[in-house]
Amino acid sequence: MPLNCSSLATKVPHTLGGLKTTATTTTIHVGGGGFFNLFSKTHQNNSLYIASLSLNKRNSSQRYCLSSSSSSSFVMEDTKDMVFSTLEPGKYSKELDIAVRAVQMACFLCQKVQESLISKTTSQLQAKDDNSPVTIADWSVQATVSWILSETLGSRNVAIIAEEDVQTLSKADSAGLLEAVVQTVNDCLAEAPRFGLKAPGTSLGSSEVLEAISRCNSTGGPNGRFWALDPVDGTLGFVRGDQYAVALALIEDGEVVLGVLGCPNYPMRKEWLSYHHRYHRIISKLTPPTSESWDKGCVIYTRRGSGEAWMQPLIQGHKKLVWPNSATPVKVSTIENPALATFCEPVEKANSSHSFTAGLAHSVGLRKQPLRVYSMVKYAAIARGDAEIFMKFARAGYKEKIWDHAAGVIIIQEAGGVVTDAGGRPLDFSKGMYLEGLDRGIIACAGAKLHEKITRAVDASWNSSSL
């Protein structure tokens, strides 16, 4: 679903790909300077091969969207190569436009931080109360996305529920950590014009970064609208150099209305999902991707009622984001036979019962080995058609959080799939930060028929399980 324009003024004429139109633009010039100097100074010898994407300007089916006005936060670049999006403007168009740009920026930030974690040290890693890891990227992404949403939509109009808080960063002995987060945020925001967003007039200070993080204090609920953000979903995968995701969803009156899922390490070749991402990095270094190839990394997005989900590559190198950034539609698989299906489950046994899902897989005739993937990348795999089933049955006492599922659920649904609890009921995002009333676990499938077969098998197997 190529993103569409929230507004178009009619003052300055332009010719776009043979199509005459008019628009008022605000041009923002990007200055020079290093990006992520905090890390680049100590990692100058570590080359990171990232595929870049060349736009096929001769492809008449590509449509580029302009969102511009005299007071717009967006940038219109290279207008001679742009034509209008074919998608009709609709509800939540502006919000989706901003959300995708914000997630693109967040993924760009994460790639830099992950490279430094893999290359040098884990000193940037902290532990939360539940012993799950949290990194500079978690806080930096949360601050960056919070700042972007507040600046573009107005702070009074933005409520965010998110995973991280400022308790650790606010401690007296965390001055070095806070300084690193502030620098990472500012380095990222300085690149905002490349993503079609306005950079801050001056660098943010520590208090402003802490405020942006702490602004994510919504408690959710059944009324009004709020954003659900998981800045780095699958932090363990992130620090291990494997799969992780940046997830952002808008929830209105208890219903998810748009979702954006950034998957920086998602390989474009399905078979690579079966390998730890370090093998992918090794191969990329041995045979670097060409400028025409799209090797890894994507953002998948949708909005409620569109009946479609779209995927675009991450922008690489020093390229600028130009809508729709070679976006392509994604659809779930048509496989209905469990014997032919690929089954996803969490990597960590602490997050889900592998023994129950293994027994269930055997009972329905699943022949393939389960695909164990960190984070909401599992939702992306189903939406893309690379897998057909995702089941998660948490151990007793564990409560699912809405930011771990909201974006992935709507993306699968609009791509043609089905997501419910084990009782066949839709997931309820109206009860605050947790998915309250969840019947046993979560089942996501590529289609209704396959979903029905799996839920029946769960019912048949549940009583014999010690879960």
Model-derived regions, located:
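DPxDG-like acidic metal-binding loop motif
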Residues: 207-211, 222-296, 303
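Oxyanion/phosphate-interacting regions
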Residues: 2-107, 115, 275-295, 314-325, ...
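Residue-level signal for inorganic ion chemistry
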Residues: 106, 110, 138, 149, ...
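Short polybasic amphipathic segments
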Residues: 307-313
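N-terminal assembly/interaction segments in proteins that build large macromolecular machines
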Residues: 123-225
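N-terminal capping segment at the start of a domain
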Residues: 104, 108-132
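Multi-pass membrane proteins that catalyze or facilitate reactions on polyprenyl-/lipid-phosphate substrates
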Residues: 169-193, 310, 324-326, 336-340, ...
